[in-house]
Amino acid sequence: MEPIVKQENPVTTSTLSTWKPAARNKTIPPPESVIELSSSNEGSELGENLDEIAEIQSVDRTGGDDVSGTKRARSDSIASPAKRLAVMIPDDDEEFLLSTTSGQAILALPATPCNVVAAPSSWGSCKQFWKAGDYEGTSGGDWEVSAGGFDHVRVHPKFLHSNATSHKWSLGAFAELLDNALDEVRSGATFVNVDMIQNRKDGSKMILIEDNGGGMNPEKMRHCMSLGYSAKSKLADTIGQYGNGFKTSTMRLGADVIVFSRCLGKDGKSSTQSIGLLSYTFLKSTGKEDIVVPMLDYERRDSEWCPITRSSVSDWEKNVETVVQWSPYATEEELLCQFNLMKKHGTRIIIYNLWEDDEGMLELDFDTDPHDIQLRGVNRDDKNIVMASQFPNSRHYLTYKHSLRSYASILYLKISHEFRIILRGKDVEHHNIVNDMMQTEKITYRPKEAADVSQLSAVVTIGFVKDAKHHVDVQGFNVYHKNRLIKPFWRIWNAAGSDGRGVIGVLEANFVEPAHDKQGFERTTVLSRLEARLLHMQKDYWRSKCHKIGYAKRQGRKSAKDTEKDTEDRESSPEFDPKGSASSRKRTVPSSFKTPTAAPRFNTPTAASEKFNPRSNVNGGGKGSVKVSKDIGYKSSEKGGKLGNSFSKSNKRAKPQGARAVEVTNSDDDYDCDSSPERNVTELPGKSSELPKPQSGPRTLSQLEQENNELRERLDKKEEVFLLLQKDLRRERELRKTLEAEVETLKNKLKEMDKEQASLIDVFAEDRDRRDKEEENLRIKLEEASNTIQKLIDGKARGR
């Protein structure tokens, strides 16, 4: 027999007139087969008081033989829809079926207890997020023992606040909610709308996040409100994986959140709509010692929405009272009106009681831009805002820290054209940072542990920002993970001067794990190697192309792969990991340990001028790695002579520099390298691995003198480079002074022009006044002449 699926009729849908809440002050006697929900003498008093929050008591599993294993049955004699729905409580936590009067079967879940403390603690007037966790709850109460004699560990309401502190940045909380909406694309979502609305109760501002995705049925709604549950971790191409984002993000933006969700029926089930309230204000004000979430569920029957009661009608009424009292809506009818604003499916999240800063103003700024949500405080830099208007290609770098519109435009590497992100009535235009770059290069990076090349690899697009010729201090890598921006403009190279300016990059690294707040990555060896590799890329790119954007060409400098200063620059990074970056340091082998026939020939002046790095004693894996003593001295195992002592006596200045060295770098491109952390032996070409005996005599002295001369020449070259840098610095300072002088001159000229303009205005005014007076005199003379002529004409006429 085909199952009967009831279709929703959008024309006759009504959420207000078809069902009315039962009377709050009326006690309904339960049927004989239903267990009375009571474990306290105060139950009747709490049920009669409308101002107090009622409690859904748990069933006493140890109080009588006839109670254990008994299921609550439905009474078909109850007339109203609310009374007609009684629930059976199973022995375990699995899903169970509610049989309706028509014989249909409804899938439901056990009710979540809503424990209430009669003596509420003071909430206080603290509306600052970082101080909201400082409150004293009530002392410990009776601990319930669940089935099997195991204790049920409570989750204190303070955990909601401490859990939300993982978001140091409020816009990161918005990103979590946008991730949830984007994941609904697989369920048919075409938009997510973020807006600011007014609270009708007190006129305060609230945040609205809504989408037209698949919605949540009662079971998914309870999973959403739970901690740590995530079905997305098993799905491909989804961002969420920890089951913690909704709670941390909403509690970071405001103290309370209410969720409305409507879901279409599947597999013969009816459509459902649910309301869930996660209120930190409610939990603190009532002195809760456990997190409880009032929820209301409704089921579509023909053209009517009927409530789904999970324990009893009185418990349903208590949940309704709790939601109405602590939500922004005054009645249950106003709550149900929110479902009229969505279509057949979707979710509306409303965050209210938004957090304030130390000055008593909202952390979020809704007034500066009517189509944006911005941050106040340290994340907002007025200088960057002015620069963003001057340098449009660097706008996202300068504004993403305080502007949600700017941050949301670069939040995803790729986004479907059919999906819209609407922020306060205006679409957010997706932006690819690559479009802001010039002279781009693409480099494929594969980590050492790469097993699947298609998944564990990253294509790094690196280039100059188009405003780099203005020497704007913009640099960093935008690192994405599964299409989501995790590290915006990650600054890796912290050079002392202007090195690295203007170099930006984009990559998607799916082989590193993001942190829980998705604003960084877990510190692992893989991340350290990626960081070191990106540092090499940026240095190579900068030193080969910096002259194209107006900087002096770095002559005589080595590339990032060969320079001995890589380690020092790497250590200057704020996220430096000595263990993780050890493999990227260089190893050197003094040429005095090699026979003349095995000595390498240097093909370039740069390679020939490499100096010995005294810190090269690093035990790292990789091809060609060598373990060498930190001191140049080497004790011969055959004669016991000290080469280091004779070397230091011959030339003390040459000791720290050492002899000519061969440098071998370890990069992640060497896939066939040994994975062991240390190798003590290096095979030299054409020779055995045994070290030769140290030489002595005039030949050794002449060799040392020759090497000393070479060291002096290299030192002179370094001094030339240093002088060149000093020259660049002086030129920059002179340029700055010149610009400052020009600015001052322009200011003086502007003042003079203002004075000249004022004097010209005065002259013109005087001329106008003088001209007016002359015109007046001429007018008077003209009138007198006219009168004289008229008199003469009249006299002549009379004489005739």
From Swiss-Prot:
Q: Which residues form the signal peptide?
A: none
Show the segment(s) annotated as Disordered.
1-76, 552-702
The molecular function terms in GO held by this entry are: ATP binding; ATP hydrolysis activity; DNA binding; endonuclease activity; kinase activity; RNA binding
Renumbered to this chain, the Acidic residues biased-composition regions fall at: 666-675
The record's statement on gene disruption is: The double mutant atmorc4 atmorc7 exhibits a pathogen response phenotype with abnormal up-regulation of several genes involved in plant defense.
Q: Where is the composition biased (Polar residues)?
A: 9-18
In which residue ranges is the amino acid composition biased (Low complexity)?
36-47
Q: Where in the cell is it found?
A: Nucleus
Q: Which residues form a coiled coil?
A: 699-766
Which InterPro entries would you find in this protein's record?
Answer: HATPase_C_sf (IPR036890), MORC_ATPase (IPR045261), Morc_S5 (IPR041006)
Q: Specify the superkingdom.
A: Eukaryota
> Which of the seven top EC classes does this enzyme belong to?
hydrolase
BP terms from Gene Ontology: defense response; DNA repair; gene silencing by siRNA-directed DNA methylation; positive regulation of defense response to oomycetes; regulation of DNA repair; regulation of gene silencing by regulatory ncRNA
Under Enzyme Commission nomenclature, its number is 3.6.-.-
Give the location of motif Nuclear localization signal 2 in residue numbers: 735-742
The terms describing its cellular component in GO are: nuclear body; nucleoplasm; nucleus
Where is the short sequence motif Nuclear localization signal 1 located? 716-723
Please report which protein family the annotation says this sequence is part of.
Belongs to the MORC ATPase protein family.
Q: How does it assemble?
A: Homodimer and heterodimer. Component of an RNA-directed DNA methylation (RdDM) complex. Forms homomeric complexes.
Outline what the protein does.
Answer: Exhibits ATPase activity. Binds DNA/RNA in a non-specific manner and exhibits endonuclease activity. Probably involved in DNA repair. Involved in RNA-directed DNA methylation (RdDM) as a component of the RdDM machinery and required for gene silencing. May also be involved in the regulation of chromatin architecture to maintain gene silencing. Together with MORC7, acts to suppress a wide set of non-methylated protein-coding genes, especially involved in pathogen response. Positive regulator of defense against the oomycete Hyaloperonospora arabidopsidis (Hpa).
Q: What is this protein called?
A: Protein MICRORCHIDIA 4
What organism is recorded for this protein?
Arabidopsis thaliana (Mouse-ear cress)
